[in-house]
């Protein structure tokens, strides 16, 4: 089973490579309404003072 994650424009998605079993969205903390990055990832990154990550593990959940 391979996960499908949305690209930055959610009309498009990609099939994740093996081992990358999470979808993620990355936001700037200053603007939490517009994601700056979306895609596949293996481990959810830690949030920082500037950047917030939202990760999930179902198809196109990002």
From Swiss-Prot:
Disulfide bonds join 5-23, 16-40, 44-55, 56-61. Shows cytolytic activity on many different cells by forming pore in lipid membranes. In vivo, increases heart rate or kills the animal by cardiac arrest. In addition, it binds to heparin with high affinity, interacts with Kv channel-interacting protein 1 (KCNIP1) in a calcium-independent manner, and binds to integrin alpha-V/beta-3 (ITGAV/ITGB3) with moderate affinity. Belongs to the three-finger toxin family. Short-chain subfamily. Type IA cytotoxin sub-subfamily. This is Cytotoxin 6. GO terms for biological process: killing of cells of another organism. It comes from the Eukaryota. GO terms for molecular function: toxin activity. It holds the Pfam family Toxin_cobra-type. Its main location: secreted. Residues 1-2 form the signal peptide. It comes from Naja sputatrix. It is found in: Secreted; Target cell membrane. InterPro entries: Cytotoxin_Cobra, Snake_3FTx, Snake_toxin-like_sf, Snake_toxin_con_site, Toxin_cobra-type.
């Amino acid at each position: 089973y391979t996960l499908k994650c949305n690209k930055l424009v959610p009309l498009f998605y990609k099939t994740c490579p093996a081992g990358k079993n999470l979808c993620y969205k990355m936001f700037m903390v200053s603007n939490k309404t517009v994601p700056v990055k979306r895609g596949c990832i293996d481990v959810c990154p830690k949030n920082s003072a500037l950047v917030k990550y939202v990760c999930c593990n179902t198809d196109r959940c990002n």
